[in-house]
Each structure stands twice: as structure tokens, then as C-alpha cells.
Regions:
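Hot-dog-fold acyl-thioester-processing enzymes
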Residues: 2-80, 136-156
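A short, structured loop/turn motif at beta-sheet edges
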Residues: 17, 118-123
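Generic short beta-strand
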Residues: 31, 114-116, 131
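Residues that cap or initiate secondary-structure elements
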Residues: 33-35, 91, 107, 121, ...
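Conserved GNAT-family N-acetyltransferase fold
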Residues: 49, 115, 127
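Hydrophobic beta-strand-centered segment that forms part of the acyl-chain substrate-binding groove
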Residues: 56-98, 102-105, 110-111, 125-126, ...
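Core beta-strand residues in small-molecule sensory/regulatory alpha/beta domains
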Residues: 88, 116-118, 134
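C-terminal end-helix/capping segment
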Residues: 121-145
Length: 156
């Protein structure tokens, strides 16, 4: 029976893993991810990237539910301000994908992340995402200092 990359995905764990560059998450392409032509529907890549960013935050100690519950003195949420996507090749049903997330820059209330979605060594999609945190009033909030340390990989 073919492996399809399952062993790597199982070894990585449900939330992926923090790496020297940031975060890596494995995901399988299901029938529901594809369009009538049999390839992954373009909007689904946004969902794969969202999972990568969310699990990176989770493993770095930042949990969406705690933010929404006011752990930092007020309810805050993440928002995507800008996204650039470069589609190079299509993923297909049963593909095992690797979603890599890196913090490119973080300052004040803004973070820029670079994401890559690969099938094996083949680059399928790249994204540059600018996000921020906002309070209940919709205004930007500064990142806590410990977040900045958690999101920036160690320089080797």
C-alpha cells in the first residue's frame, strides 16, 4: 500500500511543529478541497495557510480563544490586512501538503508572514500575509513583547 506521505504527517503531530525558521504543518487534500476539474479550488489555499498560521500561533503560546476571552485585559482578535498569493502549480486529491510559515517582520501592531505550500519539494503556492491584532473597538493593539520573541525564529 502506498504511503502518500502519511508517516511524515503523523510524525509532525496535529498542530505541526515549530522549526528553526518558524512552523511546519502537514495536511492532506480531500475531495471537499477540490473543484470540478479535480484540483484544489483556489480559495482552499487560503484555508490551508490559515491553518498554518493558527497552529504556528498555538505552538508559540498564543491561543485565539484566550484572546477573545480577554486574557490580555481586553478582547482582541487577529485580522488579515493584506495578502499576496502566487499560484505556481495545483494540488490534487490525496496529496500530502507541507505548509511552512515564517515571520518576516513584526513591529508595533503589525506582523508579516511568508508562507509556502509544497507537495514534497515542489513549490505549489506562496503567500505573503500582513496581519494585526485589534481590540473590541476595531483599533489596532501593539503586540506584547513576549509575542515578538515567540514569533521571530532564532538567528543561527
Amino acid at each position: 500500500m502506498a504511503d502518500h506521505g502519511e508517516q511524515d504527517a503523523l510524525a509532525a503531530g496535529l498542530s505541526g511543529a515549530l522549526t528553526s525558521f518558524g512552523h511546519r504543518l502537514m495536511a492532506r487534500v480531500y475531495y471537499a478541497d477540490t473543484d470540478f476539474s479535480g484540483v484544489v479550488y483556489h480559495a482552499r489555499y487560503l484555508e490551508f495557510f490559515e491553518r498554518g498560521r493558527s497552529d504556528f500561533l498555538r505552538l508559540a503560546g498564543v491561543h485565539h480563544t484566550e484572546l477573545a476571552d480577554g486574557k490580555h485585559g481586553e478582547k482582541i482578535v487577529w485580522v488579515v490586512r493584506r495578502m499576496e498569493i502566487d499560484f505556481r502549480a495545483s494540488a490534487k486529491i490525496d496529496d500530502i501538503l507541507t505548509i511552512e510559515t515564517r515571520t518576516k517582520d513584526i513591529s508595533g501592531a503589525r506582523i508579516t508572514m511568508a508562507q509556502q505550500l509544497k507537495r514534497g519539494d515542489e513549490m505549489l503556492v506562496e503567500a505573503k500575509v500582513e496581519a494585526a491584532i485589534i481590540g473590541e473597538n476595531g483599533r489596532p493593539r501593539r503586540f506584547p513583547k513576549d509575542w515578538i520573541e515567540a514569533f521571530m525564529p532564532e538567528v543561527v
